[in-house]
Amino acid sequence: MIIPTIIEKNVGYDIFSRLLKDRIIFVGGREGEVDTASATMIIAQLLYLDAEDSEREINLYINSPGGLVTAGLAIYDTMQFIKAPITTICMGQAMSFGAVLLAAGSKGKRYALPHARIMIHQPLIWGGGISGQVTDIEIESNELRKNKEHLLDILAHHTGQDKEKIRQDSERNYYMSAQEAKAYGLIDEVLDLKK
């Protein structure tokens, strides 16, 4: 991926560094996935901006298909830990953990563009398949169940929805338009397009 460079007052910035000056952070790594590397970068940016001015708003733009639960929880915990208010804006998609991060913005400051798609589902194991002894698989299965319950609690807290409704809705991929995500409580407003 080529990252554009911006020249401002004889100083060159890559586009993301320039946007960081305006307290704008983008969620996602390669292909927009929330992975350990992208989470580390997002957490560092959140901590930096909070230390710089904990009363000024941070804008978190999300266009992500989701990713690793552990990486997403690291971002989520940081969002809840810092003092600065966080505006979340979905552009394109906020799927899986992307939807959790979207909902985790400061109340009244969670938005989506009109054509954005939001999706919640239960956590899943992805990769090269499951292998190992029965005991190892049971351990992983129990951890997955704990993650599922934890994510249901987080979504219930931020949406105001009943945990059992979220459990039922997220048994399979549950897709929403921006308006449907607003009705569900994942966002507060759908932003109008200027043109």
From Swiss-Prot:
Pfam families: CLP_protease (PF00574). The keyword Protease applies. The keyword Membrane does not apply. It is found in: Cytoplasm. It catalyses: Hydrolysis of proteins to small peptides in the presence of ATP and magnesium. alpha-casein is the usual test substrate. In the absence of ATP, only oligopeptides shorter than five residues are hydrolyzed (such as succinyl-Leu-Tyr-|-NHMec, and Leu-Tyr-Leu-|-Tyr-Trp, in which cleavage of the -Tyr-|-Leu- and -Tyr-|-Trp bonds also occurs). The active site is at residues 96, 121. It is an enzyme of class 3 (hydrolase). Cleaves peptides in various proteins in a process that requires ATP hydrolysis. Has a chymotrypsin-like activity. Plays a major role in the degradation of misfolded proteins. HAMAP family: ClpP. CDD domains: S14_ClpP_2 (cd07017). Fourteen ClpP subunits assemble into 2 heptameric rings which stack back to back to give a disk-like structure with a central cavity, resembling the structure of eukaryotic proteasomes. One of its GO terms (biological process) is protein quality control for misfolded or incompletely synthesized proteins. The lineage of its organism: Bacteria, Pseudomonadati, Elusimicrobiota, Elusimicrobia, Elusimicrobiales. GO terms for cellular component: cytoplasm; endopeptidase Clp complex. Keywords: Cytoplasm, Hydrolase, Protease, Serine protease. Transmembrane segments: none annotated. It comes from Elusimicrobium minutum (strain Pei191). This is ATP-dependent Clp protease proteolytic subunit. Coiled coil: none annotated. Belongs to the peptidase S14 family. Its EC number is 3.4.21.92. Its main location: cytoplasm. GO terms for molecular function: ATP-dependent peptidase activity; ATPase binding; serine-type endopeptidase activity.
